[in-house]
Amino acid sequence: MSAQKPGLHPRNRHHSRYDLATLCQVNPELRQFLTLTPAGEQSVDFANPLAVKALNKALLAHFYAVANWDIPDGFLCPPVPGRADYIHHLADLLAEASGTIPANASILDIGVGANCIYPLIGVHEYGWRFTGSETSSQALSSAQAIISANPGLNRAIRLRRQKESGAIFNGIIHKNEQYDATLCNPPFHDSAAAARAGSERKRRNLGLNKDDALNFGGQQQELWCEGGEVNFIKKMIEESKGFAKQVMWFTSLVSRGENLPPLYRALTDVGAVKVVKKEMAQGQKQSRFIAWTFMNDEQRRRFVNRQR
């Protein structure tokens, strides 16, 4: 019997252990990265970035109909189950206004990344339409290559380059656009040194030496920014006030619980009408996202039922 992964959203497709035989049929490259655990069970060599990439290719093809997916070396290779959880919890949040998950929701992904992971999952699971913003031209090119290589995605996902240094929504949300929600996986660290130290910790935890290849890739804009996660989300909160009537829910992942109090204070300062925290768990890993809106219940109901 398959063991369940604790804490995943009920609609998440990844509750059971990976069916490696099936995934290897979907992506034969994965076979070379299989290992045996001390208990004699087949697993994937998660310390090898090529193995993680091969696993992701198989998962995205098998569960989300993304037949062609790849990312350049050095970019983050995201764990698919955790990313799917954010999408499913976001769907529940959008459902509270009308009682059903909107089938034609318009979502803005801040920092879509080279992997384009949130739009790929959201389009398949709910038929949503996505706009993805990105500061890195290389990441944008990679995401566009994924979209172009998979039939139907061009109609559902559009990308925009953030050209304004330090801006988040400004320059991305156009004057007459409306979004049901924004989502974001913000840069975690406050400096390159802190990002390196974080990778070093993960390396030690996996028993790797410094020369071992890592699954902890990531470009500067993916891993760190001035002031770290709190400052980034605070900036997002400040800018969100200017788009209060164009966006129903603003949301962002928050990596550490201790980062929440200053964010709650910032949300009070800008006059957020409602703030929600959604806790998530994947195995031992705890995470959460916060959501805020400047619309009351009636305004949100009207927003969901608007002409599109």
UniProtKB/Swiss-Prot annotation:
Its main location: cytoplasm. SUPFAM superfamilies: S-adenosyl-L-methionine-dependent methyltransferases. GO terms for cellular component: cytoplasm. Keywords: Cytoplasm, Methyltransferase, rRNA processing, S-adenosyl-L-methionine, Transferase. GO terms for biological process: rRNA base methylation. The keyword Methyltransferase applies. GO terms for molecular function: 23S rRNA (adenine(1618)-N(6))-methyltransferase activity. It is found in: Cytoplasm. Its EC number is 2.1.1.181. It comes from the Bacteria. It catalyses: adenosine(1618) in 23S rRNA + S-adenosyl-L-methionine = N(6)-methyladenosine(1618) in 23S rRNA + S-adenosyl-L-homocysteine + H(+). HAMAP family: 23SrRNA_methyltr_F (MF_01848). NCBIfam families: PRK11727.1. Specifically methylates the adenine in position 1618 of 23S rRNA. Belongs to the methyltransferase superfamily. METTL16/RlmF family. This is Ribosomal RNA large subunit methyltransferase F. It comes from Shigella flexneri.
